[in-house]
Amino acid sequence: MNARTPRPVYCSTWHLHHNLALARDICAGRFTHAGATIVMGGQPDWTRKDLRAMPAWWAECIEFNYTLDLAFAFHTIREQRYLDTWQRVVGAWAADMRPDYGSPDALARRVQNWLYSWAALEESLSFTELEPIVQETVVESLCRQAQHLKTRLASKGHRRTEQLYALLVVALALPDQEGSADLRRFAWPELHRRMLVEFPIDRRRHRAVGAHESMVELRTFLAARENARRFGLPVQASFDEHLMAAVERALMPQPEETSMPFPVTDPRDSLAIAAELLRRPFASRS
């Protein structure tokens, strides 16, 4: 692994992106989002102004969630076209689009999805290497996007948590890149503080938020905790105490809930899986 190859970080949403039909569509240049389909054959031109004419389609597309489906397809079917398509769609964005393009939320999800999917591609037995120019361009774009995101962080709430986590993912995946150490030193302590604020042990002090948002945010903290374990980051005892209390509350069935399984996009499904991570030995605490 060279300095421009990302280290694999834990992805808590990997199991939600196993759509082979979607991966085939992306290979064919068909991008379906928010109920609309746009065909971009060959090398996608992300600078096309007409793409922005459908804001809902554009907002979903530029998060690059489908790169995880491409990686799953490549890992499962081992056909080169999935790797080639990933390089085309991601490489084109990295080469043609400014690092500050899009909302901070979209940017945070985009850098995570690029890194998660890249690492998954490399785990396939069929993987050889990315084209050097694509690898260099994507890494440079990731670092520049992360630096820009740091200047546009939300001031509070679940949006700030996810954006901080995106910075941590970049820092852990690309530790040898300039600025990564600073990102890690900034993002990880900030996530500690967010954990204590967003999920106090006294549930009466827990802020009022939508159940979906709260679950998504807790899933983010679980992923952050697992990556702290993987990469040996120091973890304060208070972080684990608040996290365990939040998990126990979240997994308790509510009176209005039924025994029906969660839909695949429900963050509680990911929470149930990620909660298993907490049964592993914790990293050294500071």
Regions found by a protein language model. Give the residues of each.
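Structural helix-adjacent loops and short alpha-helical linkers that scaffold large soluble proteins
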Residues: 73-86, 118-139, 171-188, 228-243, ...
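Alpha-helical membrane segments in multi-pass integral membrane proteins
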Residues: 182-193, 209-219
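Histidine-acidic residue clusters that define the catalytic metal-binding segment
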Residues: 194-203
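Carbohydrate-active enzyme catalytic cores, enriched for enzymes
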Residues: 205-286
